[in-house]
Amino acid sequence: MVKAPSKPITLEEFLQQPETKPASEYIDGQIIQKPMPQGKHSTIQTELSTTINMVLKPHQVARAFSELRCTYGDRSTIPDISVFTWPRIPRDVNGEIANVFPISPDWAIEILSPEQSQTKVTKNILHSLNHGTQMGWLIDPNEQTVFVYLPKQQPDVFDQPEQLLPVPAFASGLSLSLGTVFGWLLE
């Protein structure tokens, strides 16, 4: 859903507004509300975040965050899962994880909801890649397909259960097949 303000607002003005439920993103001068996650989306998001954190977090390699606002390059988006390498996780003066993430994730993962535009989600992934993201995934639960995006390369499509999904180099300890990801929907 798009909310058209009576006059255009800046990114800074958008960031001063109260959060909405579901969350809204600021893209190309527009405020766009994300759809409310449904069962398949929520299952994959929870299981994938947990799996990534189980493998990468104990060794302080990286950490996965769900629904985290990332603001960079004149956009403020909320990837379904944002993975940051350990040294890039913003911290406050106490060394705790900061509330504001003014950088792109190292790995951006989006899970397509039935009412969501694949084009808009793909544009967010491409925007991230243009601002330092190493890899983007677009997971389509209805098609049981994962599109993998790398900077300045054509996307790869994974649609066979036995296919291993590529991960960024920092996540080389993580091994996931397409069948594993969509198998979570059967548990």
Region annotations inferred by a language model:
Residues 1-187:
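Gly/Pro/Ser/Thr-rich low-complexity, intrinsically disordered segments predominantly at protein N-termini
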